[in-house]
Amino acid sequence: MPVGGLLPLFSSPGGGGLGSGLGGGLGGGRKGSGPAAFRLTEKFVLLLVFSAFITLCFGAIFFLPDSSKLLSGVLFHSNPALQPPAEHKPGLGARAEDAAEGRVRHREEGAPGDPGAGLEDNLARIRENHERALREAKETLQKLPEEIQRDILLEKEKVAQDQLRDKDLFRGLPKVDFLPPVGVENREPADATIREKRAKIKEMMTHAWNNYKRYAWGLNELKPISKEGHSSSLFGNIKGATIVDALDTLFIMGMKTEFQEAKSWIKKYLDFNVNAEVSVFEVNIRFVGGLLSAYYLSGEEIFRKKAVELGVKLLPAFHTPSGIPWALLNMKSGIGRNWPWASGGSSILAEFGTLHLEFMHLSHLSGDPVFAEKVMKIRTVLNKLDKPEGLYPNYLNPSSGQWGQHHVSVGGLGDSFYEYLLKAWLMSDKTDLEAKKMYFDAVQAIETHLIRKSSGGLTYIAEWKGGLLEHKMGHLTCFAGGMFALGADGAPEARAQHYLELGAEIARTCHESYNRTYVKLGPEAFRFDGGVEAIATRQNEKYYILRPEVIETYMYMWRLTHDPKYRTWAWEAVEALESHCRVNGGYSGLRDVYIARESYDDVQQSFFLAETLKYLYLIFSDDDLLPLEHWIFNTEAHPFPILREQKKEIDGKEK
């Protein structure tokens, strides 16, 4: 109500009282213009303003839920490891970025899902965040100022010592005896039809590479419709993702000229001294992984040096109270943080759980155990935690070392953690028995709580949210068919055949997700509810971004069973890629796999060259090209040799 309408009631000087005031007010003449009346009016206005100010302050205190976090942030501003993450939108989507850029296997939750479930999750997350923030604030306030200062100084000293050691490490790499790689002779298949199909896949690689070279050379990825470069925020200012990711595919396919071009660019231009924030996971699997495999295949020293240099740059990500690394790292300052959307600032299982293979090889090639120690610390933390129903939630807080939201997935956010448990055991020449036990214990829990069979007989892997199942399976989850089959070798004899059959069932389900689309390429996610089976029902799940996981499973199933249907299914994918994804400027993902009219996303992902085309090429090659008895593929399809000569050393470290 306007203040002016009230003043005549209190400012009549003539003792006319309330009635007089009303009369004056209605008559339109404002009485009470004398000094005494002015003082009363002024006091009343000031009283109202003061009341409004008090109300505003109280409301701010009451309605700002993050005030305790603000306090915590101010007190800890000198300690990056304890500083809560700033509000930030992580690119386009989610494995944020994953939903649109297609590669952060663990980041699918950045995209909106079911509104009801999302609201409930958000409320639970808000309550959890508030409780955690209050606890942190209380703990902080209980500390004496000198204790806080001591903690800050200790952390600074630790960082300085680590940086000094890292510089010493990079100054002089020890000499290593390069062993000629096993199984890289690129012999032609005896069968003429298979030989012709393999040649076609090599031509696809040539088309993808030449257009990247023509329109986006030195940049991270290609926009094949626009015919220009494309860079995801996942890589910060680091350049050349496609060059590094494609190195081993070029080598394996015998594209020697292109391999030398890539090597020359890396030697001259690949620079990690950038002031930018990167995804530790993505940089590790693509850049570290690509450089390591290029070294092991070619013996070129530049690749070893660059891999170790980058590994050193990533070490500050581990400067957390628990040793669980941050998801994001500024390459210059060494300051890390987590994705803002990740369950109260948690680290993500598939991200911190997908460092083991690369970091073990970094220690092997550098002679410094620090890399192996970092990933073994992650395992120590995980083994001390209780697992709900034997399952590993997707979120773990790096400060408290405790689980975040209880969401379990073998697809986005969780997938490659399980893959790396199995492959850590295999890569150690089957001496890492701890990794083997963790893998089979996890698989048993997955079978009990997540694996289901539809009414139509399709086996699928659901997601687990606080004890409730969401009957959805992502394209990313389709890698698990190959994982189960590969793990059959280490299972008890009575279970080995079971795991081969389970892998075959997952392969069939994922093939059905392809076969039930118009373009014969699978959607980002597909569901088993409401009478629907292996079909995407939501528009934001109908896209295909040149992903490799289904073809990855075909490759393992072919190598382990030699059932000809896997080559048939792989060739169906080749024909679909050529019909619907190939354009003049390269290969593009699709926005909707259920419609006839192509709607391109205009991105040629680097993993299309690193994974999709490599797995297709291996399916139509003989088994002695990169034989599984000698090579382990990281989650970006970069082959690493099994560390046979390091058997005793690794066994001793991991006990």
Swiss-Prot record:
Mind listing the GO molecular function terms for this protein? calcium ion binding; mannosyl-oligosaccharide 1,2-alpha-mannosidase activity
Cofactor(s) this protein cannot do without: Ca(2+)
Q: Which gene encodes it?
A: Man1a1
Activity regulation: the record says: Inhibited by both 1-deoxymannojirimycin and kifunensine.
Membrane topology category: Single-pass type II membrane protein
- Taxonomic superkingdom: Eukaryota
User: What is the official name of this protein in its record?
Assistant: Mannosyl-oligosaccharide 1,2-alpha-mannosidase IA
The glycosylation sites annotated in the UniProt record are: N515
So what EC number does this one have?
3.2.1.113
Taxonomic lineage from the root? Eukaryota, Metazoa, Chordata, Craniata, Vertebrata
Q: Which family does it belong to?
A: Belongs to the glycosyl hydrolase 47 family.
Q: Could you say which residues bind Ca(2+) here?
A: T635
Per UniProt, the enzyme's principal EC class comes to hydrolase
Its job: Involved in the maturation of Asn-linked oligosaccharides. Progressively trim alpha-1,2-linked mannose residues from Man(9)GlcNAc(2) to produce Man(5)GlcNAc(2).
